[in-house]
Regions:
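Membrane-interfacial amphipathic/re-entrant helices at transmembrane-helix boundaries
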Residues: 1-28, 56, 64-71, 98-101, ...
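Helix-loop-helix "hairpin" substructures at the membrane interface of multi-pass membrane proteins
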Residues: 21, 143-221, 245-251
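Transmembrane helix-bundle core of multi-pass membrane transporters
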Residues: 93-169, 196-199, 261, 268, ...
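Alpha-helical transmembrane segments within multi-pass membrane transporters and channels
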Residues: 65-109, 116, 250-251, 255, ...
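Transmembrane alpha-helical segments in multi-pass inner-membrane proteins
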Residues: 25, 65-77, 198-208, 212-213, ...
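Hydrophobic core segments of alpha-helical transmembrane domains in multi-pass membrane transport
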Residues: 54, 58, 76-82, 107-117, ...
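Cytosolic-side transmembrane-helix boundaries in multi-pass membrane proteins
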Residues: 10, 89, 120, 181-188, ...
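Membrane-embedded helix boundary and interhelical linker motif in transport proteins
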Residues: 3, 38-85, 89
Length: 294
């Protein structure tokens, strides 16, 4: 069976790859959007923190016998804690300065982290086994859907929507937004604003680490796994709107699908299609599809 002259199995296979990539685009851009939207910091360390998540899971499995499910719980906390240290010791000095200072600092930190892991582990990838419960695939009738990839898509969607709900629809989210816009007023109500800011950054970093754990069984774990991805994720955030939570989610999944379809119909453009879209969006709507002009 063919669709638009393309074998249906090839088309749906690329759509699946697009959804998988979109799941990671959404998770990572969500973390970036949370950090920028609430803290006004462009966190270029995000790709390295994604890599850290994959490595903590891999080291936990090989050195401590930590299974996948425990890694899903422990890794975001461990890597998020490193984010808390970074925020308290470095980033808090930059909140009132231009975005460029935060960008340069986090870019430098990313290079340091990546360099340390490359020196220790080399550049070759290391496998992380798919959990036994997710081995095998579902036969949908027109394609085989690997169970683990189905889990990643569903879990990413649930995590993204849950984060959006907490930030946009709960009292905690209202406090977070208010602390960004008027910290003195929020502090007057007895809320520890510096602690909220620190935990928010730690949460955003934890999302990157969680994405790293989920990516480990799909992509090989290596020190450069976040280096190229972070450029794409920044483009996703810009297209969706800097600081827009829903923009990060919708744009992440949407661009993953567009990228997958491009590989079917015009493979040569698949590596640049997201950046072409970013250029068009910046020309037509500089604040992003879901962003608001300030």
């Amino acid at each position: 069976m063919e669709i638009f002259g393309i074998p249906s199995q090839a088309l749906f296979g690329q759509l699946l790859i697009g959804l998988i990539n979109g799941s990671f685009y959404a998770l990572l851009s969500l973390g970036l959007a949370v950090i920028f939207g609430l803290l006004n910091i462009i966190n270029f360390t995000h790709g390295a923190q994604y890599m850290l998540g994959a490595f903590v899971a891999w080291l936990g499995l090989n050195k401590l016998g930590m299974n996948y499910w425990l890694a899903l719980l422990v890794t975001p906390v461990v890597v998020g804690a490193t984010g808390v240290v970074i925020e308290r010791t470095m980033l808090k000095q930059l909140y009132k300065l231009d975005h460029l200072y935060g960008l340069l600092l986090t870019f430098g930190l990313a290079l340091i982290i990546q360099g340390i892991f490359r020196n220790e582990f080399g550049s070759s990838g290391m496998p992380y086994a798919v959990p036994e419960v997710f081995q095998g695939a579902f036969n949908t009738g027109f394609m085989f859907l690997p169970k683990y990839r189905a889990w990643v898509i569903v879990a990413s969607l649930v995590i993204c929507l849950s984060t959006w709900y907490v930030i946009e629809r709960t009292k905690l989210g209202a406090y977070l937004r208010a602390a960004t816009e008027n910290p003195n007023l929020v502090q007057a109500f007895g809320i520890n604003v510096p602690r909220m800011i620190t935990l928010t950054y730690g949460f955003g970093v934890g999302l990157a680490a969680l994405a790293g754990v989920m990516a480990a069984p799909i992509y090989q774990v290596n020190p450069t796994m976040g280096a190229d991805l972070i450029i794409v994720v920044f483009a996703v955030v810009v297209i969706g709107g800097m600081g827009s939570i829903m923009g990060a989610i919708v744009t992440g999944f949407g661009l993953g699908l567009i990228e997958g379809l491009t590989k079917v119909f015009y493979p040569e453009a698949s590596n640049v299609v997201i950046f072409v879209i970013m250029t068009l969006v910046l020309l037509l709507k500089p604040a992003g599809l879901f962003g608001t002009q300030k």
